[in-house]
From Swiss-Prot:
Pfam families: AP_endonuc_2. GO terms for biological process: base-excision repair. Zn(2+) 3 binds at residues 182, 229, 231. Zn(2+) 2 binds at residues 145, 179, 216, 261. This is Probable endonuclease 4. It comes from Geobacter sulfurreducens (strain ATCC 51573 / DSM 12127 / PCA). Its cofactor is Zn(2+).
Length: 296
């Protein structure tokens, strides 16, 4: 596809199968786990496996493949086993992505576990200040994902994300993945034209739109400021279709990857349904309208 719309794809049977799966459902971009997302240790692909993955990527004609780190990682954890395992796992993620040729990693910033926001952010920054120099061959970008703010999770405010980026020794290596479900659940209302303009103006002021490098497009089963992360099919949750219409017609984000993480079925049916829903929201506009960056 010519657009930058896609979905998270399974790596069952080998990561090399993911590009064709994405192509089959009509993706222009895809996201993958590079290992089992619920295990600490993952297998490093051989040179041959990595070459096959890159060949399949090219054959599928995808603009980009983005990696998502495993869910177990918590770089905000205090010193101890979880932090040690998290550092090792993220380092391995960077190494795998280097071998595979993937230059973008999405990650959840972490949870402070009751030690406070400031302490958690400091620990995240300290972790990255160790990790970036440890894997110099990874020259890509790490995307901090906006979170719903469940429990003690960090990343549910733009201020927190800005503090993490500014607090590292390598701010140029970091950007943001904007998850629509998470951000809405965290209290940012972009379901109206006015709200949409306000939220992205605030993002631009605190972080910069140049650092918005990926969207996770998900509707939400829960309401505004619920602090609960529950994804729903596009247009069938509490967000509704309007914010997705705004995003799909915002020229500032035309070439920013937009990845579905909506519920899966037994086959490709739901991914195809959600991709079609989003593409139907794109409207034909005049040249004058295309110069207007925000929804009317």
């Amino acid at each position: 596809m010519n657009d930058y719309l896609g979905a998270h794809m399974s790596i069952a049977g080998g990561i090399h199968k993911a590009p064709a799966r994405g192509n089959r459902v009509g993706c222009g971009v895809i996201q993958v786990f590079t290992q089992n997302s619920n295990q600490w240790r993952g297998k490093m692909p051989t040179e041959g496996e990595a070459a096959l993955f890159r060949e399949q990527w090219e054959a599928a004609g995808l603009h980009e493949i983005i990696a998502h780190d495993i869910y177990l990682i918590n770089l905000a954890a205090p010193p101890g086993e979880t932090r040690d395992k998290s550092l090792a796992a993220f380092r391995e993620e960077m190494e795998r992505c280097t071998r595979l040729g993937i230059g973008t990693i999405v990650m959840h910033p972490g949870a402070h576990l009751g030690d406070g926001e400031e302490t958690g952010i400091r620990r995240i920054c300290e972790a990255f200040n160790r990790l970036i120099p440890a894997v110099p061959e990874f020259t890509g970008v790490i995307l901090l994902e906006t979170t719903a703010g469940q429990g003690t999770s960090l990343g549910h405010t733009f201020e927190q994300l800005a503090a993490i980026i500014a607090g590292t020794a390598f701010p140029d290596r970091f950007a943001v993945c904007f998850d629509t479900c998470h951000t809405f659940a965290a209290g940012y209302d972009f379901t109206t034209g006015e709200g949409y303009r306000r939220v992205f103006a605030e993002f631009d002021r605190l972080i910069g739109l140049d650092r918005l490098r990926c969207f996770h497009l998900n509707d939400s089963r829960k309401g505004l400021n619920s602090r609960v992360d529950r994804h729903e099919h596009i247009g069938r949750g509490t967000l509704g279709l309007e914010p997705f219409r705004f995003l799909m017609n915002d020229d500032r984000f035309t070439t920013v990857p937009k990845i579905l993480e909506t519920p899966k079925g037994d086959d490709d049916e739901f991914d195809i349904m959600n991709l079609n829903t989003l593409r139907r929201l794109v409207r034909r506009r005049t040249t004058k309208e295309r110069t207007e960056p925000c929804p009317s």
